Amino acid sequence: MVDKIGETNTLCPVCMKTIKAEKIAEDDVVYIVKTCPEHGSWKVKIWNGVEHYKYLYEFAAVPKTPEKFAVPQIKDCPHDCGLCNQHMQHSCLNVVEVTNHCNLNCPICFATANGCGYDYHPDMETIRGMFKTVVDYVKSPRCIQLSGGEPTVRDDLPEIVRMAKEMGIEHVEVNTNAVRIAKDIEYLRALKEAGVDDFYMQFDGTKDDIYLQTRGKSLFELKEQAIANCAEVGIGITLVVTVSPNINLDHVGEIIKYAATKVPTVKGVHFQPIS
């Protein structure tokens, strides 16, 4: 039995035009069914478990529109680039890149740090301008993630955090590989005193053979030290796992069990799969 459970907009995978689609339930699986007048029809699986899919929609929040819009609507979403008036929701977490420098050279790197071919290490006034954009466009609560590269290579990161707080940004998260906060607890204390609320910490498993493949060196002991330091200082952590099918996919359960032993310092685990 096939039931229609909703409608949405999607893209033709051939011409990339925006087309209408139906969400259907069939054999306890949710699919999107779409047809492009020029290129035909597709049926795409999007979720296992119809009731679970519906249950998740109970958590949908009332959207908060942006304070203002940055660009005019020219075409339609997602073909325009920028914050146009089609955006019903303001930015929930604004990623602010403060460097492309890094103290690791990971075989797997989402930012291509140390290998992007140019140097990016903005001064304080440039960063102030980025923070002002967040304040101008985002309704409270304003949340940012300082990212890179590796933000903690900056000795002035506590000053950057303090500036964000003074400008009205309520929540400051730092994306980190944990190298510096494991080795330099006084630097960690300075970040805490400046106003860092939590760390988004790279964590690929509990065995060094995993890190040798994902990060190029043994790092598990360092990760444990970083967690211990954060527990001492009083800063929460989200463990961020790059999941590779050939490296640590079968280690996901062990990571969750490990994280549970580090509560309340570890607040959660975020899985980022790669193919």
Kindly give the residue locations of the regions a language model identified.
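Acidic, low-complexity/disordered tracts enriched in E/D and polar residues
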Residues: 2, 8-9, 17-20, 37, ...
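Short recognition patches in nucleic-acid-associated and regulatory proteins
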Residues: 11, 16-29
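Conserved alpha-helical substructure of the radical SAM core
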Residues: 28-43, 47, 63-176, 180-186, ...
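Radical SAM/AdoMet-radical enzyme domain recognition
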Residues: 128-145, 154-273
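Short, surface-exposed linear segments at secondary-structure transitions and domain or protein termini
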Residues: 50-60
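A short, sequence-level motif marking secondary-structure junctions
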Residues: 25, 47-52
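Short, flexible, mixed-charge glycine/proline-rich loop motifs
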Residues: 1-7, 24-29, 99
